[in-house]
């Protein structure tokens, strides 16, 4: 009994302290039962997220800034230019055996290609808005194009792969761009502190006096001069042991050449690029003669700056230009260029299993062949000419002889090689002329059919009116026939008159 009483007293004391602390309302439940702790899961469900008062800071990029530039003015052109540059870098890294950088550049090209499609669609929409006269929509679409361009350049991470100057041309200023000429780590050395300079010590036996003390009270300088003369030690005279040489009298450079006959300037044999020599006479006009190292053509103008490059581009018969990437290459190396080095084809061709010339991989997988296939390998020590498929001994002299004299399919034998764009334009003009000629022939045929139909209808009208299915009379032919009849009658009448006169 005593224990239960003590417990009741303690419980009453607990309730008083609890009510004094303000917890009575929480302890009393709706059902009036005793207070029980809530489960943790229910407590989480009832707890609401409060406002903690955190500032809403906008995200700002550090080290990456964009601005307007000449190259980045047109979003579509800037994206295409950047994609082409990254594609070239991907090929260069692949040739240098750097697969990671090559993969990064190629993935950036893929992202930029997707952005290019979006920009093309937006450009069409903007053109339609301009045609309709909706300037607000056109301006909004232009802003969307700039946003797509900025997002594409930033998400492609091109600033991590391209140089600082190239990215600034696109309006991107990033501190993450690699330095073009980084300083090697071995060359860096910490700066050493400069050693303090030592002050010159004054001799002990010499007195130091200021200039003010040396000056006299008078303004005249005689006293100063006399004091210096007295303190100066007498000069020591040196007696020469050898007689001095006479000095040469210097003359003016122009006066010294008066009356002096210059020596003849020798004629120098200047070697040409091909190995031959030409007499370069300084008293005559320059010849600018040069020799092509490939076709051995010696011509005036090849020695001039840019003359040899122009000769290689259109006139050298030993070289040709790839019809896919427009790069110059030797004819003897054209097959290897198409298979391994052409940037436009990008490993889409391989060597033919039958002849060894270039063929598309898809055609060879399907079992097809190319039009110039000879069906067998070239003889030992020779190669097929990629222009005419004639076997040529694989050395420089035989290739030169073949391309200058024997290759019937060498376009440069008859003159300079035409620009592929000009050739394409000529082909289009020929096709257009043939199409127009066919159109004129069809129009002429249609006109003749209409005339025949009109004549048939006129003949049918005559038949319906007269009941006689006669032929239509040509008025011109009728007039000619009547004139012939009249001329014949006149001739007969004159003949009769002459006969009458003879009888009389």
Swiss-Prot record:
Q: Where is this region: Disordered?
A: 1-59, 171-255
Classification via InterPro entries: CEP104-like (IPR052607), CEP104_Znf (IPR048738)
One Pfam short name: CEP104_ZnF
Composition-biased stretches, type Polar residues, lie in 213-232
Output the superkingdom of the source species.
Answer: Eukaryota
Regions of compositional bias (Basic and acidic residues) in chain numbering: 36-50, 199-212
Query: What protein name is recorded for this chain?
Result: Uncharacterized protein C40H1.3
The organism encoding this protein is Caenorhabditis elegans
